[in-house]
Amino acid sequence: MTRLILQRLVQMALIMVFASFVIFAIFDTDEFKRKLAVAELGGFGVAALSEEAYANWLAQKGLDVPFHERYAQWVGDVLQGDFGHSFEKNRAVGPLLAERLWNTAILAFWVFALMIPLGLLVGILAGMNEGSPRDRALSFVAVFTTSIPEIATAILLTVVFALGLGWLPAKAAMIQGFDPWQLVLPVLTLVLYAFGYLARMTRASMAEVMTQPYIRTAILKGLPYRRVILGHALRNALIAPFTIIVLQLNWLLSGVVVVEVFFEYNGFGRLLLEAALFGDVYVIQAATLVAVAVAVTSQLVSDIGYTFLNPRIRFGA
Amino acid sequence: MSTTLERPTRPSLLARLENPKAVIGLVLLMWLPLTLYVMAPRLLGSLHDVVLLPAIPATLLLYTLAVRAFRGSTVAVIGLSLVFFWLLMAVSAPYLPLIDPNRPIAPFTPPLTEARDHFFWLGTDMRGRDLLSRAIWGCQRVLVWGVTATTVAYVIGTTFGLVAGYFAGWWDEVISFASNVLLSFPVMVLFIVILTYLGPSGLNIIVAVTVASAPAIMRIVRGLTLDIKTRDYVFAAQTRGEHPIYVMLIELLPNVRGPIIVDACLRLGYTTVAITTLTFLGLGLQPPDPDWGLMIREAARSAMLWQFSYMLLVPALAVSSLILGFNLMADGLRELSLRD
């Protein structure tokens, strides 16, 4: 067990080192640096930047040293919490990123708070009797909601609830301070898209458990059906969904981009896109690094949790 | 035993077409002209106006064949019908009586009304361009770029998967580590990083989709290969002294096909969503040609009102129906493959 966790930790560290290298290397090209120089020094564009001014700027920023030194410098700064400076927003990247991540965390909290009970409930109800009309109906709903892309779900919800009925605000820009009503549509969009996957995985796991001999024994020895489900089936059926739930965090970091942009919610995804469209290199580097760190950590938690929950693996390895 | 001799009847056209060669031929007849039409219109020269004509009967024949092959699953037939509806729209768009999709006529015309001598079934957008025409022309770009990107991702992912699974050892170590690194990026983050680095365009979307999906495909193929390479027929081929490339292409590849086809249907859906979403975000295909993501982007900026909501709904429903088609097709195929 300890060995497995250590092995995983080493693997995760290796992936982080490699990923950070890739992220640093692809944005450390001459082209991006010239753009940055123009943004800082002012001027009419990359073509008008003289070689001399560019060389001076590089020297002033300490960027004229060899690549590996710059990389080491960047990693050192990042480890100390210094993520550089955003040119578009004209402020330090660290606090900016923290602020946006907090907003996305609020969104993610509500998404998980709704998605987990809904997905598990639908999955368990469908998987209890595989092939029954209830299973077919619930499975169809799960496939259907997952098949509609987030952008389309966002549009449908906005048109009906914001533009048509006028019950909810159409945007979540939160210009006049935090307003929980503005969160409803983004959260609903993400939940509708994501719960179907969890429900399908829970259903598959539940359906498999229900075919096991010990369930048949429990039924045959006359236990009430409720106790068979709650006491015997669920314990084993929920191991696989647990890993899925943790891994959904990785998906959520992708999913929030389009939802945050559509609803103009000031979260991590919108920050990343704005930085990408502007060419705000330090923001892209920092945001990507954080995204990878979150994804790798959730992978680790999911793996360790799985081993912990499933004794067959814990003692087998 | 009955002794009556049956007079040999000529098999019907459909029955004769039910073999892999004919199906591949039909797919090429449908797909090559469409790809050229969308990606390299200048290359076609004077053929430009007629090149898609033979693709229309090819599409219809393929649809009939597919329905016959998958008639055991209602879900698969519904999915097929949705996908083939858009395929048919894509190949026949130039010959349908549509208004030019880029021509501004009467801005903000609601659906089912006539304005300036034109009847608009689905209304017009804020620049007065016909939405019906834009929705139908838009599916061409989404389908062509989506399918091409997925195909490229599959070719590369499968190659690496076969190599990693068959040679094992340090080939496997290196390929698996590289794919683990790529898989640790959230997909949309990876797309944004790649498209920022390369710049937004159709070709770069192919690169981005390949980098993002090839690792996952490689994992599936690698797993299947590790299982299949212990079979007797693989040993037989190795003992005969066949070249590794022969073993991989002739012995292994045909046997990993089944699970991959289901995965490909799902992945076609993901890619279509990704292209639409990236275009909506401003990182994908560029204006002014019609495209669903672009239609959403333009409408979301300037028409956020109840009376103009049709501008958002048309592209949203179009893309949803296509994705639903791919997903139902994958579900039906899985159901059918489990039944055998």
Question: Model-predicted segments: where are they?
Answer:
Chain A
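Juxtamembrane/transmembrane-helix interface segments of polytopic membrane transporters
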Residues: I15, A19, I23-D28, A154, ...
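Alpha-helical transmembrane segments of integral membrane proteins
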Residues: T2-L4, L97-R134, E150, I175-A317
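Hydrophobic alpha-helical transmembrane segments of membrane transport/permease proteins
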Residues: I15-A72, L165-Q182
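An internal, D/E-rich "acidic patch" concept
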Residues: Q60-L120
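N-terminal Sec/SRP start-transfer signal
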Residues: M1-A13
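Membrane-water interface segments at the C-terminal ends of transmembrane alpha-helices
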Residues: V22-K33, A55, G76, F140-P169, ...
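Coil-to-alpha-helix initiation sites in intrinsically disordered, low-complexity, charged segments
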Residues: E52, G62, P66-W74, A92, ...
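Transmembrane alpha-helical core residues of multi-pass small-molecule transporters
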Residues: Q11, A19, L114-M115, A142, ...
